[in-house]
Amino acid sequence: MDAGKTTLSEGLLYVSGSLRKPGRVDHGNAFLDNYALERQRGITIFAKQARFSSPSADFTLLDTPGHVDFSTEMERTLQVLDYAVLLISGTDGVQSHTRTLWRLLKRYEVPTFLFINKMDLAGTDRAALLAQLRQVLGEGFVDFDAEDCEESIAMCGEEAMEEYLQNGSVKDTTIAALIKSRALFPCFFGSALKQIGRSVV
């Protein structure tokens, strides 16, 4: 799947200061794709580990293969994740392999954020993509950039709804609990290559 997973990972390492310059898969100089065969084919074959920090926390990033041929390597990694970021191409939408990944994330009960990539390209439709996610994968997908974000979050749980009705907002701790329990899946839209929306993730 050419959704831009490694490009996003390189970008996260770059903005955190862990890389001086982000590599590019198409240029064959991606930091995370460091095996010759990976650079030759332009895909991730082996899971890689990298560390980066934000002002509030330290993170260990695991960049996993996205191609269907290397699903075993990816599934092995899922079993140790605290959280996952699932990348979807804005030009392709939900594919059959996306559904497979989603079933695995559900099986291993991994709280999941979504980054819908390549939104800078022609033909992408944010509303249509969000509707497709809900139709194909289920409920709980919320566009965290939308004006009605709080209302949509409130629909994901009783406690969240009570807080929203009383205060017009939902507490961060409640949102975190919804994400942890896989009742809420925050969605972010952008372009990893052009650094649009990437810093939010």
Spans of features found by a protein language model:
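P-loop NTPase catalytic nucleotide-binding module
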Residues: M1-A3, K21-P22, G90-V201
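P-loop NTPase switch module centered on the Walker A-proximal segment
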Residues: M1-V80, A84-I88, V94, E109, ...
